[in-house]
């Protein structure tokens, strides 16, 4: 999967089509300020949507709860297509925010700090906590 930010080029639809023509799956990355409507007419070209629930740049930031509504909106857009499009969330994912993301419609989570905090002896406990048990 090759994912691009809508803001990174002038023709998102052409970029997504080209990625797929070259044999890769295509993804779109949403920064916190990116509106979901930007992909409204190109859902057939998308295989993955990644919602950044923090402003990209460094780990350990707090989850932006305002992104839950965006996840819900994107889930509705995906469901309307009848296609399987992964909906992934990255940024501030913790044992507390993971269930909120899943309830909002996410199908995959990226967790860095929540997995690695406390060092290798804590990884298993941290992963269990993310899974809800």
Residue ranges and their predicted role:
Residues 102, 116-133:
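C-terminal helical cap(s) of enzyme catalytic domains, especially alpha/beta-barrels
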Residues 49, 74, 90, 101, ...:
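Conserved, mostly hydrophobic/aromatic
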Residues 55-57, 92-96, 115-116:
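Short Gly/Pro-enriched loop/turn and capping motifs at secondary-structure junctions
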Residues 34-46, 91-109:
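Catalytic cores of alpha/beta
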Residues 13, 64, 99, 120-124:
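Conserved strand-to-helix beginnings and helix N-cap segments that scaffold or border functional pockets
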Residues 1, 26, 108-109, 115:
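A short hydrophobic/small-residue beta-strand
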Residues 1-86:
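Conserved anion-binding
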């Amino acid at each position: 999967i090759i994912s691009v930010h809508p803001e990174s080029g002038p023709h998102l639809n052409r970029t997504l089509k080209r990625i797929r023509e070259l044999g890769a799956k295509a993804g779109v990355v949403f920064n916190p300020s990116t509106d979901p409507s930007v992909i409204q007419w190109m859902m057939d070209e998308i295989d993955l949507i990644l919602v950044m629930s923090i402003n990209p740049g460094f780990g350990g930031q707090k989850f932006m709860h305002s992104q839950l509504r965006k996840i819900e909106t994107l889930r509705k857009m995906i469901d309307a297509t009848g296609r399987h499009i992964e909906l992934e969330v990255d940024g501030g994912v913790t044992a507390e925010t993971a269930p909120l993301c899943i309830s909002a419609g996410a199908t995959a989570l990226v967790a860095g700090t929540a997995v690695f905090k406390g060092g290798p002896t804590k990884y298993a406990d941290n992963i269990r906590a993310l899974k809800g048990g």
